[in-house]
């Protein structure tokens, strides 16, 4: 009985103490803001007293951010984006951290970090493609040595789902235009994968133009690509990403080390559609899928 009373007293003491979190965002773009809202709302909904300090690397000097965080000594740092993750790893790695919206976590995180990747399971993407238009059966993609694992995952999933896959490895960036032309000439759907070596402004523009020219449905990585001319983009729900990160931070508040908390995948997925592109591709999107879309572009244009 005495032991139980002591444990209960310790729990109440921890629960009543105010926890603190520093939030470092790589920029002030809307997706980052949505994730921050989700992170804050997690604790608000649980009636937890958490003090927050926010920093955006868009408009604040990195030296000042690091200095203030060192002075505040928060219980956890919530980091959004690769730039913020790199800063946290190099200069404030002694404080437990939770990350999200980092394309390649292995390159910028350390043992004192955990978080949520942006890696949406391939099976979810392929099933969504089939829902949008069952006629899309020939899938194309480009990959590099850095995204080889993702290519192999997609190849396995395509085989399991009876989809044909045409893929090409990119060694030199100068090979990208010809590779796009070659692949889009023999597929009806092109799946973009996270790989900064392949996808940058000029290559994305070239892909979207070739997609329309060859009536190939381009599947993008976020609504940015849909607005620019992709048929659809399957994306994370950023507010829910923040919520998931809040759950990880809660466990750190409770005494768990980030090294004991597995990096997780997104739980909630959303997608955006471009109706004008769909019309040009001859794809008639079912009304129920239009209703489910988080954003629709190309209406009335």
List the model feature ranges, each with a label:
Residues 2-11:
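Bacterial N-terminal signal peptides
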Residues 17-301:
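Short hydrophobic alpha-helices and adjacent helix-cap/hinge residues
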């Amino acid at each position: 009985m005495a032991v139980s009373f002591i444990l209960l007293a310790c729990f109440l003491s921890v629960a009543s103490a105010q926890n603190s979190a520093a939030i470092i965002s790589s920029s002030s773009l809307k997706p980052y803001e949505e994730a921050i809202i989700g992170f804050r709302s997690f604790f608000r909904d649980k009636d937890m007293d958490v003090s927050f300090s926010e920093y955006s690397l868009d408009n604040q000097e990195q030296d000042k951010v690091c200095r203030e965080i060192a002075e505040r000594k928060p219980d956890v740092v919530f980091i959004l984006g690769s730039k913020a993750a790199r800063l946290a790893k190099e200069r404030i790695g002694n404080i437990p951290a939770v990350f999200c919206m980092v394309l390649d976590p292995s390159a910028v995180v350390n043992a004192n970090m955990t978080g949520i990747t942006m890696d949406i399971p391939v099976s979810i993407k392929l099933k969504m493609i089939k829902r949008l238009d069952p006629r899309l059966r020939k899938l194309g993609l480009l990959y590099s040595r850095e995204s080889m694992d993702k290519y192999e995952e997609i190849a396995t999933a395509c085989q399991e789902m009876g989809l044909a896959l045409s893929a090409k490895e990119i060694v030199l960036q100068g090979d990208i235009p010809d590779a796009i032309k070659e692949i889009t000439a023999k597929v009806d759907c092109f799946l973009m994968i996270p790989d900064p070596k392949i996808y940058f402004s000029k290559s994305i523009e070239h892909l979207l133009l070739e997609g329309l020219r060859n009536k190939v449905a381009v599947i993008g990585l976020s609504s940015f690509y849909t607005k620019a001319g992709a048929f659809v983009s399957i994306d994370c729900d950023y507010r829910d990403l923040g919520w998931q990160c809040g759950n990880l931070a809660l466990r750190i508040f409770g005494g768990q080390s980030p090294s004991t908390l597995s990096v997780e995948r997104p739980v909630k997925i959303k997608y955006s559609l471009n109706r004008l592109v769909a019309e040009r591709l001859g794809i008639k999107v079912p009304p129920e899928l239009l209703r489910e879309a988080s954003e629709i572009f190309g209406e009335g244009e």
